[in-house]
């Protein structure tokens, strides 16, 4: 009930009424290995100074399911539910910031529209966390 009364809950209800709400969106996203593991990639580059110029960087595929996204007039809103038992919102931000960044990147590539907002809703804290 707390979620439905939250700002995100109200916005989702409005988006659903406008036909602009999507749930459980699967995706696959190709990300350069150097983006995910920059320290390792830099170390490999340093060790192979004689590396072949034509060698291509590895791509890592990330797949997942976005809990909820909806469209408002000025962009997309990404919402991820979390049930983790944490003490405060900053713990969830630290744990899941990268995950939501990749989710946003996937949505932007898929829909060719900007993600204007990334939100975590913590059921344990009964709180919206804007990233």
What are these regions (language model features)?
Residues 1-131:
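Structural signature of nuclease core domains in nucleic-acid processing machines
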